[in-house]
């Protein structure tokens, strides 16, 4: 089932402390951004990629796209101050498609199998997001003091991609913009419309590159996958 994907790529990545867009940092000699883009470039069901970028980084990103032969990118609109604004910027330029995915550009380890499950779920139910079950004991804390232990069985750690029927995510984005609501993710905008969002079990490897420690973990994942391919 075909889809297009939006990748907000205009963030600052302050927690990485790299002094540059973290998406340009390399994992095994290749930029994080390219690792992520190649997942969708190589997926035959992906018909288009939209990258929201900083204007001052557009030329460099285009050079990367050319160097690594990423041909599915349909647009590089300006990113906004927040992720939600960047996604909305891309949505305004898209023509109608069946399914739209929104994915963190700093999550390069998503698999085609998980993507396919998300697209199917979004087709069936309208909205679906990737997530994994919480593994650690969870505590509710206020002012440095534990208030209660939360039931872990009902808790999921949410990832991306998040997948939606086109008309649903457009409506959710438009309503949020009109009332000035800023959500933490696209699913939250859809939830505000009263629409049910389904969850698709993902992988603990689908980590977001946020800190220097994540880079070490990311390189370990790449090496493990390379070994599996050669077995």
UniProtKB/Swiss-Prot annotation:
Keywords from the UniProt entry: Isoprene biosynthesis, Nucleotidyltransferase, Transferase
GO molecular function: 2-C-methyl-D-erythritol 4-phosphate cytidylyltransferase activity
Cited Gene3D superfamilies: Spore Coat Polysaccharide Biosynthesis Protein SpsA, Chain A (3.90.550.10)
Alphabetized InterPro entries for the sequence: IspD, IspD/TarI, IspD/TarI_cytidylyltransf_bact, ISPD_synthase_CS, Nucleotide-diphossugar_trans
Site note Transition state stabilizer, residues: 15, 22
Site (Positions MEP for the nucleophilic attack): 152, 208
Nucleotidyltransferase recorded as keyword: yes
Known catalytic reactions: 2-C-methyl-D-erythritol 4-phosphate + CTP + H(+) = 4-CDP-2-C-methyl-D-erythritol + diphosphate
Ranges in a coiled coil: none
EC code(s) of this entry: 2.7.7.60
One of the GO biological process terms: isopentenyl diphosphate biosynthetic process, methylerythritol 4-phosphate pathway
Keyword Nucleotidyltransferase: yes
Metabolic or biological pathway, per its Swiss-Prot or TrEMBL entry: Isoprenoid biosynthesis; isopentenyl diphosphate biosynthesis via DXP pathway; isopentenyl diphosphate from 1-deoxy-D-xylulose 5-phosphate: step 2/6
Top class in the EC scheme: transferase
Family named by the database record: Belongs to the IspD/TarI cytidylyltransferase family. IspD subfamily.
HAMAP family: IspD
Functional description taken from the UniProt entry: Catalyzes the formation of 4-diphosphocytidyl-2-C-methyl-D-erythritol from CTP and 2-C-methyl-D-erythritol 4-phosphate (MEP).
NCBIfam families cross-referenced by the UniProt entry: ispD
Name of the protein described by the UniProt record: 2-C-methyl-D-erythritol 4-phosphate cytidylyltransferase
């Amino acid at each position: 089932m075909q889809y297009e994907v939006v990748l907000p790529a205009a963030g600052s990545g302050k927690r990485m402390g790299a002094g540059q867009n973290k998406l340009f940092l390399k994992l095994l000699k290749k930029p994080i951004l390219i690792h992520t883009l190649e997942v969708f470039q190589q997926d035959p069901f992906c018909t288009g990629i939209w990258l929201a970028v900083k204007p001052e980084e557009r030329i460099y990103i285009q050079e990367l796209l050319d160097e690594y032969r990423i041909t599915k990118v349909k647009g590089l609109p300006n990113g906004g101050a927040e992720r939600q604004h960047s996604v909305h910027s891309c949505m305004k330029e898209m023509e109608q498609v069946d399914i739209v995915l929104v994915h963190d550009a700093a999550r390069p380890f998503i698999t085609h199998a998980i993507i396919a499950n998300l697209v199917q779920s979004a087709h069936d139910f309208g909205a679906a997001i990737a997530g994994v079950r919480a593994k650690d004991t969870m505590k509710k804390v206020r002012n440095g003091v534990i208030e209660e232990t939360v039931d872990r069985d009902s808790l999921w750690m949410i990832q991306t991609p998040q997948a939606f029927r086109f008309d649903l995510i457009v409506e959710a984005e438009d309503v949020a913009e009109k009332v000035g609501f800023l959500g933490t993710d696209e699913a939250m905008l859809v939830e505000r419309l009263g629409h049910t969002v389904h969850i698709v079990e993902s992988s603990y490897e689908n980590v977001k590159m946020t800190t220097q420690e994540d880079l070490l973990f990311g390189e370990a994942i790449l090496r493990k996958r390379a070994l599996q391919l050669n077995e």
